[in-house]
Amino acid sequence: LEGIDQIIRHIPLAILENETVISAYLIAIKLLTTPEEDGHYYELKQLLAEKSSVIDIREVEILYTHLRYYCIRQKINNGDTRFFDELFEIFQIQLSKKLLLKDGQLAPQSYKNIITVGLRVKAFDWVEQFIREYTDKLPEDEQQNALNYNLSNVYFYQKKYSKVIELLQEVEY
């Protein structure tokens, strides 16, 4: 990414301002090169909220992934827990736009991460609904265990311990 500022300076401003995808990627570059400036995160998030309908869906997927990674790698992993709420919102947006599904399936790691973040922000009802709605999008051989284990996790956070025990007895290790 060295020298990117010099390249950007040579692109006519009118082109940058009128091209949504180029603008989005320029903001993403700033997000990567100056991670301490949260403003770039919010700027890209706002641009996507307003203009994602005019951007190719593959580009939208990539740009939301940049936002998600920023929340995780630059903020949460460095102790900025405020970004759990942001990460949760990004996951919700990605789900609503079906950006996390590949051939109708959700990667088990994404499923787990969404649940973990949802529980962290205490969105228990939402997480329970997510589990019920998306477990069938996991590989078939993982569905029943994922359902039982993750529902038990929700019930644990809700202090419904008898349900936790009941569900954990059904989990195969």
Task: Give short role names for the model-derived ranges.
Residues 1-33:
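Flexible inter-repeat linkers and adjacent short helices
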Residues 9-17, 49-61, 92-105, 132-143, ...:
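Solenoid-like repeat scaffolds
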Residues 23-29, 66-70, 109-113, 146-157:
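"A position-specific structural signal for the A-helix of alpha-solenoid helical repeats
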Residues 29-34, 73-77, 116-120, 154:
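Residue-level signature for tetratricopeptide repeat
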Residues 73-74, 82-104, 111:
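Acidic, serine/threonine- and glycine-rich low-complexity intrinsically disordered segments
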Residues 80-84, 124, 161:
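TPR-repeat structural position
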Residues 112-122, 131-172:
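Alpha-helical adaptor scaffolds
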